[in-house]
A protein has these predicted regions:
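As written
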Residues: 25-26
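Active-site pocket-lining/capping segments in soluble small-molecule metabolic enzymes
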Residues: 1-16, 20, 30-211
């Protein structure tokens, strides 16, 4: 039979929302990018308690998925006002700067300062490989894997829509490598240090899902 996975593009994810959807029932809940570790842990703990009281075996319980690589969305998915298709650029990727407006015109010195600040935030060119690939260039949650595991996340979402096939292959390999490092690490500090040394030896994009 078919299983229902609730998309990570829903407007809100919390215990009350999950309670409303239990009547369907759901096999998997996908958290969106703005959920904190505490949010996720609270929702998962609430569901696990319901399953325990209902006598549901742990392996048959609801699955929980979180975003881990690519396409960090400043509009939080459900509130996107852009059009996503391969033929047009995404609104969220159009360069812009926020600045003070004076008499209907942007203040020039403020614009210049913000522009320089934006350039400073770009990843170091040395972090890219010879094909122009940088793991997590448009959004990354690999450093958060330890905390996602602690929160009770069972599955990870690697976004691949519109991406190059060879870059997707590298993403999958890097995610596998990160999970191997996670399994071998004794604590979060060891995990992050090893991850940065092996997966990001020249630095990362610093476009973190989970701050």
């Amino acid at each position: 039979s078919c299983e229902i996975h609730l998309s990570g593009e829903t407007g809100e994810v919390n215990s009350e929302m999950l309670k409303m959807f239990r009547r369907f029932p759901l096999k998997r809940l996908i958290f969106h990018r703005k959920n904190t570790f505490r949010d996720m842990q609270s929702v998962i703990a609430s569901q696990r308690e319901v399953e325990k009281q209902a006598g549901i075996r742990p392996e048959a319980g609801m699955e929980f998925e979180a975003f881990v690589l690519n396409e960090m969305c400043q509009f939080t998915g459900a509130f996107c006002n852009s059009l996503h298709c391969d033929e047009m650029g995404y609104l969220c990727r159009v360069s812009y700067w926020l600045g003070t407006v004076r008499n209907g015109d942007a203040v020039p010195e403020k614009i210049m300062a913000l522009q320089e600040q934006a350039w400073d935030q770009e990843p170091d060119l040395k972090a890219y490989d010879e094909s122009g690939y940088l793991c997590g260039e448009t959004g990354c949650g690999l450093c958060a894997l330890y905390q996602l595991k602690q929160a009770g996340i069972t599955h990870l979402k690697l976004v691949g829509r519109g991406n190059y096939v060879d870059h997707m292959e590298k993403d999958i390999r890097n995610l596998r490598k990160a999970l191997e490092i996670l399994d071998a690490a004794e604590n979060e500090r060891e995990f992050k240090c090893t991850l940065k040394r092996i997966v990001f030896p020249a630095g990362c994009s610093e476009r973190c899902y989970y701050q």
